From Swiss-Prot:
Function summary: Inhibits post-transcriptional processing of cellular pre-mRNA, by binding and inhibiting two cellular proteins that are required for the 3'-end processing of cellular pre-mRNAs: the 30 kDa cleavage and polyadenylation specificity factor/CPSF4 and the poly(A)-binding protein 2/PABPN1. In turn, unprocessed 3' end pre-mRNAs accumulate in the host nucleus and are no longer exported to the cytoplasm. Cellular protein synthesis is thereby shut off very early after virus infection.
Name of the gene encoding the protein in the UniProt record: NS
Superkingdom in the source lineage: Viruses
Sequence motif Nuclear localization signal, residues: 34-38
One BP term from GO: symbiont-mediated suppression of host gene expression
Motif Nuclear export signal: where in chain: 137-146
The protein, known as: Non-structural protein 1
Family according to the record: Belongs to the influenza A viruses NS1 family.
Location of the region described as PABPN1-binding in the Swiss-Prot/TrEMBL record: 223-230
Subcellular location: Host nucleus; Host cytoplasm
Organism for this UniProt entry: Influenza A virus (strain A/Goose/Guangdong/1/1996 H5N1 genotype Gs/Gd)
Keywords linked to the UniProt accession: Eukaryotic host gene expression shutoff by virus, Host cytoplasm, Host gene expression shutoff by virus, Host mRNA suppression by virus, Host nucleus, Host-virus interaction, Inhibition of host innate immune response by virus, Inhibition of host interferon signaling pathway by virus, Inhibition of host PKR by virus, Inhibition of host pre-mRNA processing by virus, Inhibition of host RIG-I by virus, Inhibition of host RLR pathway by virus, Interferon antiviral system evasion, RNA-binding, Ubl conjugation, Viral immunoevasion
Amino acid sequence: MDSNTITSFQVDCYLWHIRKLLSMRDMCDAPFDDRLRRDQKALKGRGSTLGLDLRVATMEGKKIVEDILKSETNENLKIAIASSPAPRYITDMSIEEMSREWYMLMPRQKITGGLMVKMDQAIMDKRIILKANFSVLFDQLETLVSLRAFTESGAIVAEIFPIPSVPGHFTEDVKNAIGILIGGLEWNDNSIRASENIQRFAWGIHDENGGPSLPPKQKRYMAKRVESEV
C-alpha cells in the first residue's frame, strides 16, 4: 500500500476530528455540519477499503499535523493564503437562457446531493445540449449555479439547480445529478451532448466536438436509477 495514501488518510481523519470538536461546541454553521456528515461517511468507506482503524489513524494523523505545525511560521501561512487562487465564473448560458420560464408535459424530478433535477419525460428523439453556469476553483467545477438542457430549437427540456434550503454541494454531487439527467433523457432516445465547459471542468475531458460526458455503462446505470427512483 502506498505510504502517501496512508498518510493522507491519517491526516484527513485527524482534521475531521478537529472539525467535529468545533461542531460539538456550536462553533460552525449548517453547511459546515453538512460537509462533516458527508466526510464521515467517506472516511468510513476509505478506512474499510484500506483496512485501517479510524481511531488509530486519527492518532497518527495528529502526530503528523503537530510535526508540521512546529515548523510552520506565520510568514509561510501568509504566503500560502496570498497564493490561493480565487474562483472564476464560467457562463455557457446568457441571462435570458438562465431566467426563461419553461414548462413540462410529463414532469419528473429528483433531489440528489443538495441539487434538484427536473426533466420533461415527454421529450423524445431530440438532439439536446447541456449548458451550465458555475464557478471554478483549481481548474475544477466548484459550485453549480444552474444547468439547463436545450433542444436544437432552443426549448428548455431539463434543469439542475441548487436547493436553497439544502446547504452546499460538491463536484461529485453535480456529476451524479448530470448523470441522472442524461440517463433520463436518453431513456427516450434523445441524443445528449454536454458543453465543452461542462466536460472540461466536471470530468476533466477536453472535447471540442461535445462528445458524451459519461461512459455508456454509467449512463445506462443512471437511466435505470431514473426509471426506478425519479
